[in-house]
Amino acid sequence: MAMKIGTQKFKERVSDGLDNEFMRGAVSSAQERLRARRLEAAKELGNWEEWRSLAEEIRQHVLENLDYYLEQLAENVAKKGGHVFFAQTAEEATGYIRDVVKKKNGKKIVKSKSMVTEEINMNEALESDGCEVVETDLGEYILQIDDHDPPSHIVAPALHKNKEQIRDVFKERIGYRNTEKPEELVMHARAVLRKKFLEADIGITGCNFAIADTGSVSLVTNEGNGRLVTTIPKTQITVMGMERIVPSFDEFEVLVGMLTRSAVGQRLTSYITALTGPRLPGEADGPEEFHLVIVDNGRSNILGTEFQSVLQCIRCAACINVCPVYRHVGGHSYGSIYSGPIGAVLSPLLGGYDDYKELPYASSLCAACSEACPVKIPLHELLLKHRQRIVEKEGRAPISEKLAMKAFGLGTSAPSLYKMGSKWAPAAMKPFKEDGKITKGPGPLKQWTQIRDFPAPNKSRFRDWFEDRRKEKGEDK
C-alpha cells in the first residue's frame, strides 16, 4: 500500500464518508472516548502545558541538529553489529529491503505496525517477489485480509469497521466459525498469527523513536506482537522516518509518556520495547542479523522551510481525535494513509499538490488540533500556509474562484462600483431567493448552497440606513 489510497476524487471520497452512517457514529464515539481519556491522563500528569513545551523543545532540538544525531545513531548501530542504510527515496528503501530478504532466502515475513512501510509501499514490493508478508497488529491484519482495505486512523487503523464486519471477514478468509464477540475474534486471530510468527524468516518493524546515543530502536505497542516480530525471526529489519529520533533515553522517557497519554490516554502502553543490535553471544533471544533502514522520502525537503515543525509529529493522532472534519468524513476521505489534520499538512508535502491540493481546505481552522498536539505543532497555521502557497506560488486556485476574487477586489476598490453592486445585488439574486434565503446559488455559490442556505442581500443597505440616520439627527456629512 502506498501513501495514496484509492483513485476517487476528493469530493467523491467525502461524499462516501458522509453517507457512511456507521463510520460516522464509530468515529464520533471513538473521538469522545479518546479525547476524554487524553484529558484525564493529562490532568493526572499535572503541568501539562509545561510537559508540552518540553516535548516541543526536544523535537525542535533534534530537527535543528538532525544530521548530528543521525550520524551518531548510525555509528552506534554499527558498533553493536547492526547494518544501517540511508534511503533517499521510497524505491531505494524497498530496494534495499528486497535485497536483504533475497540474500537471506526469506519467504515468510511477519511485520508489526508501521506507517512508513505503508508510505513506501513495502508490502507490495515484497509480495511481487513471491514473499508472504503478514501484518501482526490486529487492526492492520484485519485490513490486510480484507483485500488490503486501507487504514482510516493512525493509531486505530480499523476504526471504520464494526465487529460484525470483522466476523464476516474472518469467516471468509481465515476459517472463523464463532460469533462476533471481540474476545472470540481475538483468540482466533491469535492462534492464526502465532503460527505465522513461528514460521517467519524475517521480521520487519517500524520505529517509534530511535535513541541516538545507544543505537537502539523502540516500539510502543499494546498487543505484544512487536516483541514476537523482533525475537523469533533470525533477521530483523527496522524501517524509520529520518526524523523519528531522540538524543538519549532521557528524552525518550518524556516523549513516550506524551505519546501514550495523547494517543490512548494511558500512562504507558502494555509493551515498550527497546532493541539494540543483533543477538549477542549468551543472549537467549533476538535476531541474528539486524538492519536499520532510515527513510528520507521527501522529509529533507521540509527541513529549513516554514513547514519544518510538522516533522515534530510523534504519530499520536491526538489531532485526529478532536478534528470536527474528520469526525464527519472519516479517514478514507483524505486519500492518504496520513489522515486528519496531520495528514492534511503532511500529505501535500510528501506526495505533492497534484494528489492532495484539497486537503489544506478540509479544515474549519478551529485550532483544536493545535491545542491537542503534545509537541505543539501549529497545525492550523500550517494549513493556512498551504492555502497561501497553493494560491500564490502554485497558482492552483480554481478559475471561478480567481474571477470571483478579482471581481470582488475591483468592486471594493472603487466606491462607485461598490455602491452600484450593493444597489443591484438584491435584484440580481432574486431568481435564486426563497423565503429570504438563497437556496440554489449561481457560480461560486453553487457548492456552498448545496449544503447550506446563503443569506440573501437585503434591499435596505446599511449605507442608506446610516445616511438616513444622520439626516434625521441633522448631522453634517
Swiss-Prot record:
Residues annotated as binding [4Fe-4S] cluster 1: C313, C316, C319, C373
Bias kind Basic and acidic residues: ranges: 461-477
InterPro entries: 4Fe4S_Fe-S-bd (IPR017896), 4Fe4S_Fe_S_CS (IPR017900), FTHF_cligase-like_sf (IPR024185), Helical_ferredxn (IPR009051), LUD_dom (IPR003741), LutB (IPR022825), LutB/LldF (IPR004452), LutB_C (IPR024569)
Domain of life where this protein originates: Bacteria
Record's keyword annotation contains Iron-sulfur: yes
Region described as Disordered: 433-477
Binding-site list for [4Fe-4S] cluster 2: C323, C366, C369
Keyword Ribosomal protein: no
GO BP annotation list: lactate metabolic process
Keywords: 4Fe-4S, Electron transport, Iron, Iron-sulfur, Metal-binding, Repeat, Transport
Domain 4Fe-4S ferredoxin-type, residue spans: 304-334, 353-382
SUPFAM superfamilies assigned to the protein according to its UniProt record, in alphabetical order: alpha-helical ferredoxin, NagB/RpiA/CoA transferase-like
Pfam families for the chain: Fer4_8, LUD_dom, LutB_C
A GO MF term: metal ion binding
NCBIfam families assigned to the protein according to its UniProt record, in alphabetical order: LutB/LldF family L-lactate oxidation iron-sulfur protein
PANTHER family: LACTATE UTILIZATION PROTEIN B (PTHR47153:SF2)
UniProt similarity note: Belongs to the LutB/YkgF family.
Role, per record: Is involved in L-lactate degradation and allows cells to grow with lactate as the sole carbon source. Has probably a role as an electron transporter during oxidation of L-lactate.
Protein name: Lactate utilization protein B
Record gene name: lutB
